[in-house]
Amino acid sequence: MNGSSANPRAALSSAMTDPFGRTISYLRVSVTDRCDLRCFYCMSEDMTFLPKADLLTLEELDRLCSAFIAKGVKKLRLTGGEPLVRRNVMTLVRSLSRHLSSGALSELTLTTNGTQLAKYARELADCGVRRINVSLDTLDPKKFREITRWGEIDKVLEGIEAARAAGLAVKINAVALKNLNEDELPSLMRWAHGKNMGLTLIEVMPMGEIGAGRIDQYLPLSLVRARLAQQFTLMDLAESTGGPARYVSVAETGGKLGFITPMTHNFCESCNRVRITCTGTLHTCLGHEDASDLRKPLRASDDDMLLADAIDRAIGLKPKGHDFIIDRRHNRPSVSRHMSVTGG
């Protein structure tokens, strides 16, 4: 649906379709730009975070999410930064779970670095969360500290076990990093599959200034897959989630392996998602500088008609594809905002 609705009331519950016929059914919401780690491909060591006064309240985030659910969103993922470091975030999770109970929402989930999972896993499960993604690039404690700048891997592994004990299905997300974890990816896959967890490998994305050259970090997953195919039997799976990952089954482990390849394969043709930052900015594409302010219409009225109309206008601006490219000449990111702000 593009432009303003002729019937504002109808806009409250109208489905969201972009200019290229893609229906938007998946919302990713960054509840904070803060994180208790500083992964070097994601953040600079001396990050300047958003003033807390600029953030939407948890009640405003709930209202914003609910407006998208009314317009057809079926899957909602909370991200960050690290979502579980947001003060009182579980009140938001518990409140949003009402949409699971009503059937309006099919899935409520989150992506986390795992450091807070030991504390929150059981409560997440009690709120109706069934699956989570955990970002983990290595099982080597020394490498983990190097990547995160100060993290302790035992805390993450404890959190993963707490999540599994609570009945949550866990999928591991790992960024492939040249000369750092590339030799470890086969063993990381065996470990994940051995615990009945999926693994998705991700190429470095050129987002935000991080004080390092991404060309030094970038490892094409086409190369990773070719190497894995020398050791394992990889069978392409036909399943599609409307997202960027392409999946294979691994005969030797019985598990599933995903590849997210923004740099080597455009994954935009079936994109079904949009992203909201913790300040209420809507980004219809991860790899595009587009931005629509939803905080202003959210706060302008207690009636959601202005908000619904603003959402429709923003969806009408969703681009056909992303602008990701590594600027080898000037060493500049394709997108100026950091992943921690966008909520990858």
Swiss-Prot record:
**Keyword annotations of the record:** 4Fe-4S, GTP-binding, Iron, Iron-sulfur, Lyase, Metal-binding, Molybdenum cofactor biosynthesis, Nucleotide-binding, S-adenosyl-L-methionine
| Record carries keyword Nuclease | no
GO MF annotations in UniProt: 4 iron, 4 sulfur cluster binding; cyclic pyranopterin monophosphate synthase activity; GTP 3',8'-cyclase activity; GTP binding; metal ion binding; S-adenosyl-L-methionine binding
Reaction(s) catalysed by this chain's protein: GTP + AH2 + S-adenosyl-L-methionine = (8S)-3',8-cyclo-7,8-dihydroguanosine 5'-triphosphate + 5'-deoxyadenosine + L-methionine + A + H(+)
Q: Which residues bind S-adenosyl-L-methionine?
A: 41, 81, 135, 205
Which of this chain's residues are annotated to bind [4Fe-4S] cluster 2? Answer: 268, 271, 285
Q: Name one Pfam family in it.
A: Fer4_12
Q: What is its EC number?
A: 4.1.99.22
Q: Which GO terms describe its biological process?
A: Mo-molybdopterin cofactor biosynthetic process
The cofactors it requires, by name, are: [4Fe-4S] cluster
Binding residues for GTP, per the UniProt record? 28, 77, 111, 171, 273-275
Pathway connected to this protein:
Cofactor biosynthesis; molybdopterin biosynthesis
Q: Determine the domain of life of the protein's source.
A: Bacteria
Q: Which residue range or ranges hold the Radical SAM core domain?
A: 19-244
Q: Which PROSITE patterns does UniProt cross-reference here?
A: MOAA_NIFB_PQQE, RADICAL_SAM
Q: Which sites bind [4Fe-4S] cluster 1?
A: 35, 39, 42
Paste the cofactor note. Answer: Binds 2 [4Fe-4S] clusters. Binds 1 [4Fe-4S] cluster coordinated with 3 cysteines and an exchangeable S-adenosyl-L-methionine and 1 [4Fe-4S] cluster coordinated with 3 cysteines and the GTP-derived substrate.
Query: Which NCBIfam families did the record assign?
Result: moaA (TIGR02666)
The protein's matches in HAMAP family, at most eight in alphabetical order, are given as: MoaA_B
Q: What does this protein do?
A: Catalyzes the cyclization of GTP to (8S)-3',8-cyclo-7,8-dihydroguanosine 5'-triphosphate.
The similarity annotation says: Belongs to the radical SAM superfamily. MoaA family.
**Subunit field text:** Monomer and homodimer.
| Name used for this protein in its record | GTP 3',8-cyclase
Origin organism of this chain?
Answer: Bradyrhizobium diazoefficiens (strain JCM 10833 / BCRC 13528 / IAM 13628 / NBRC 14792 / USDA 110)
